[in-house]
Design a protein with these regions (language model features):
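N-terminal intrinsically disordered, cationic/polar leader segments
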Residues: 2-114
Length: 114
């Protein structure tokens, strides 16, 4: 759905599914001995602690209907377009950006999209 047509309920549902997907991916990786990334969720904020001490923060921004990502490589803002989070600057999809940032910080290929 276009960003302009998103209701508060739609935003909260999509944001919750997105954070839950990230957490489920981290749990799957831990169980499969892929990588141990600790996560801590406080409301709409999810903090990932990667090996080596670096962090990635994913934060919901309900008033703006955005999802923000802060990583070593920079800060990114995402808006939902047709049900997919897209970077407001270059249009990159959220999970693709998260995967590239996490891979760079972890020193190994990680894919959050599946």
């Amino acid at each position: 759905m276009p960003a302009s047509a998103m209701t508060d309920a739609d935003y909260h549902a999509l944001a919750a599914r997105t954070l839950a997907h990230v957490e489920a991916t981290l749990d799957r990786w831990l169980e499969s001995d892929v990588i141990d990334i600790d996560s801590q969720r406080t409301g709409g904020l999810l903090e990932l602690s990667l090996p080596g001490g670096s962090k990635i923060v994913i934060n919901t921004q309900p008033p703006l209907h955005e999802l923000w990502l802060a990583a070593r490589g920079g800060g990114y803002h995402f808006k939902a377009i047709d049900g997919t989070w897209r970077d407001t600057r270059d249009g990159e999809e959220f999970f693709a950006r998260l995967s590239s940032e996490a891979s760079a910080q972890a020193g190994k290929a990680l894919d959050f999209s599946s």
